[in-house]
Design a protein with these regions (language model features):
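Alpha-helical transmembrane segments of integral membrane proteins, especially early/N-terminal helices
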Residues: 4-25, 53-55, 60
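Extracellular beta-strand/loop-rich beta-sandwich domains predominantly from IgSF
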Residues: 329-334
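Non-transmembrane, membrane-proximal soluble domains of secreted or membrane proteins
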Residues: 2, 22-44, 66-304, 313-315, ...
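C-terminal structural segments of small proteins and small subunits
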Residues: 342-348
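Sequence/structural segment immediately N-terminal to covalent heme-attachment motifs in c-type
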Residues: 211, 337-341
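Residue-level recognition of secondary-structure-to-loop junctions
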Residues: 200, 336-337
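Transmembrane alpha-helical segments in integral membrane proteins
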Residues: 55-71
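Alpha-helical transmembrane segments
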Residues: 41-57
Length: 360
């Protein structure tokens, strides 16, 4: 019996050493790039360190029992029963109970509270809105609004080593806000706002690290797999320059003044559909298009292209409005193009909100 314990113990020790070496030396997960991610990574590593000896003991006893007591094809009769408990079950119960208590306290209570804690006075607030099938990022302090489309993947820009508070919601179905590099994920729920706070700890962009992306992690419909956005973590100076560029871009987007006698039309979007699918205008003169987006909190725009092929291949529109969430009314002023048939659409919903512009 002592020999059995010695061999099984030696086997357990060998498996434990190998397992602990793998845990300590091999990176099983991508490196965390946020303070909360580092807390999560530390908790997982501790759980693995504590789990390896328990797992190794089960494997060692199982392997030794199979090898030691193998009888081939003809098992003997049952041996005599073993009576009494001995110390081993009590030691096993004490060790596993102690490990369980340790895990409940740390990382259970301490790490969990650190990860879910909210930053009451963050350096930056980003309002994140999910919709089928893209993301909208609003920086209320900087008056910046970025809305993605299937053909124009948005980029969320964050300053490194600054606390960021994400206020997350959805306008249609359940989505999930997940940035793999930050090791953080939370649902975007219609009608409510969920919050996570973190501090990015490393600069980088999606072009150099594919983990720096916002990915919807909740099956949300036909184009769920395409619901992604890029993330860039930059220095404080680069972030300030980006903010200035975005604000200048918004300030410079001004419509020309309509002239007397311009052709005037109105198109309405409601329930993510245009109220008309064909518009006719005269080739000469100016066109004033009023776009009325009546869908609350849903982003739309109106843009006209040379053709449907030009729109789907990334061509620039002849005219169009910026993407904005409703309810909102926009005015688009442009010179009528040459006679012909043109294609218009909502760039956010390019398969369901389309139509034809006939220029005569």
């Amino acid at each position: 019996m002592k020999r059995d314990f010695a061999i099984a113990g030696a086997l357990w020790l060998i498996i434990t050493v190998i397992g602990e070496a793998l845990v300590l030396l091999v990176e099983f997960y991508p490196a965390a790039q946020s303070d909360k991610g580092e807390e999560i990574e530390s908790a997982f590593r501790l759980l693995l360190i504590l789990a390896v000896p328990v797992f190794a003991l089960v494997v060692a006893v199982l392997l030794y029992s199979v090898m030691r007591h193998s009888t081939g094809d003809t098992p003997p009769e049952d041996g005599p029963a073993l009576h009494g408990r001995g110390l081993v079950p009590f030691i096993w119960l004490g060790v596993t109970s102690g490990l369980t208590l340790l895990i409940i306290i740390y990382p259970g209570l301490t790490s969990l509270s650190a990860v879910i804690s909210d930053e009451s006075n963050p350096d930056l607030v980003v309002e994140v809105t999910g919709f089928q099938w893209q993301w909208q990022f609003t920086y209320p302090q900087q008056d910046i609004n970025i809305i993605g489309t299937p053909d124009d993947i948005p980029e969320m820009v964050l300053p490194v080593e600054r606390s960021v508070r994400f206020e997350i919601t959805s306008v249609d179905v359940l989505h999930s806000f997940w940035v793999p590099a930050f090791l953080m994920k939370i649902d975007a729920v219609p009608g409510m706002t969920t919050i996570i706070s973190l501090r990015p700890t490393k600069t980088g962009t999606f072009l150099t690290d594919s983990m720096l992306r916002v990915q919807c992690a909740e099956l949300c419909g036909l184009r769920h797999s395409t619901m992604a956005a890029h993330v860039a973590v930059v220095t404080e100076q680069e972030f300030e320059e980006w903010v200035a560029d975005q604000q200048a871009l918004s300030a410079g987007a001004e419509q020309p003044t309509p002239v007397t006698g311009a052709q005037e039309f109105t198109i309405v979007s409601e329930d993510s559909l245009f109220d008309v699918d064909e518009i006719q205008v005269e080739a000469s003169g100016q066109v004033v298009m009023t776009f009325d987006n009546r869908d609350a909190a849903v982003p739309h725009n109106w843009a006209v292209y040379e053709s449907e092929e030009a729109a789907t291949s990334g061509g620039a529109p002849i005219a169009g409005s910026p993407i904005e969430s409703g309810p909102v009314t926009q005015t688009i002023v442009f010179d009528a193009p040459e006679p012909g048939t043109y294609f218009f659409r909502c760039d956010v919903h390019p398969t369901t909100m389309t139509g034809v512009l006939e220029v005569r």
